[in-house]
Amino acid sequence: MEKWASNQEVLGTWLSLPDSHAAEIAARVDFDYVCIDMQHGMADYQVATVMLQAITLTQKGTPICRVPWNEPGIIGRMLDAGAQGIIIPMVNSAEEAVRAVDATKYPPLGQRSHGPTIIGGRARSLGEEYYLSLIHI
């Protein structure tokens, strides 16, 4: 995440296939990020959760997830599952952008609830500065 914060070039990969082994292999290649594509890829919530865990356990690439649409429930679930970055598509107005960002941050900065499912329960321990929100407009 340090490269993102300092505007350095980052190199990553996208995963469309729902496979935790592919996620682990991609993370071990030493990409800066590995993105699970739930919008156009084949991963559902359960598979994406295992893929995020596989990426996280390598302690290499930042685990990112592109959710299917701008919906607070799925955004929160993927963050709870271990995504350190969320790509939010289908954002068509300033109001929708605010709603998307609110779904990624805990109160008082946003509306995200706390319910981590990730290994070690790190969700809140990382701090807001370690999460990335990318909005497709």
What are the language-model segments listed below?
Residues 27-28, 51-58, 79-80:
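Acidic (Asp/Glu)-rich catalytic clusters
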Residues 40-54, 71-74, 92-107, 122-127:
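Active-site-adjacent beta->alpha loops and helix N-cap segments on the catalytic face
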Residues 135-137:
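Conserved small/polar residues in nucleotide/adenosyl-binding loops
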Residues 16-27, 70-77:
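Short, acidic/polar
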Residues 29-33, 80-85, 105-106:
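Glycine-enriched alpha-helix->loop->beta-strand junction motifs that scaffold or abut catalytic
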Residues 1-12, 126-132:
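N-terminal amphipathic alpha-helix/helix-capping segment at the start of soluble metabolic enzymes
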Residues 22, 29-50:
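Glycine-rich, proline-tolerant flexible connector loops at the mouths of alpha/beta enzymes
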Residues 11-13, 34-36, 63-65, 86-88:
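Hydrophobic faces of well-ordered beta-strands that scaffold small-molecule active sites
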